[in-house]
Regions:
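Non-heme di-metal
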Residues: 1-156
């Protein structure tokens, strides 16, 4: 869940950037035409893989195509933002793919070597080759643990 929320917050910021461009056109009529896939699954692996696919689609071809149209219409600053954000979408796709790979390999909560695992709820760090089944501090389940090196805002 945390990887989806973390990414969604970044996507929200992308939306704000484009919303601010729209605000500059207040009072005008513009046409916006687009579609977006609806991928709702109960299976986490399917969610991760579809998120990976959709982020890669935004990376190439969707956002570069939007950038080209913006540039053709004289909105070079908007085109530049689409190109910059496209690169971020690739990072999102890579992240979803990494977690999907770990899940497929049965290594999301298990490692071949000793690692530090962080509870994303309370910050408890556990050193072992496997994340605990539940956090000994806050009792949240294993799903709240990530490798410390993958936890947001950590410096190693």
């Amino acid at each position: 869940e945390a990887v989806f929320k973390f990414t969604a917050n970044q996507e929200k910021e992308h939306g704000k950037i484009f919303y601010n461009f729209l605000k500059e056109m207040t009072g005008e009529n513009i046409t916006i035409d687009g579609s977006y896939p609806v991928d709702i699954y109960d299976d986490v692996l399917k969610l991760l893989r579809s998120a990976q696919h959709n982020e890669f689609e935004e990376f190439e071809p969707v956002y570069p195509d939007f950038a080209a149209v913006a540039n053709q219409e004289g909105f070079t600053n908007i085109g530049a933002k689409f190109n910059q954000i496209a690169k971020i979408e690739k990072t999102h796709g890579d992240r979803f793919g990494m977690f999907a790979d770990l899940l497929e390999q049965g290594k999301l909560f298990v490692s071949d070597v000793e690692e530090e695992w962080m509870c994303l709820n309370c910050g408890y760090v556990h050193k072992s080759s496997e994340a605990p089944k539940s956090c000994p501090v806050c009792s949240h389940p294993q799903g709240y643990f990530v490798r410390l090196k993958l936890a947001p805002f950590t410096t190693l």
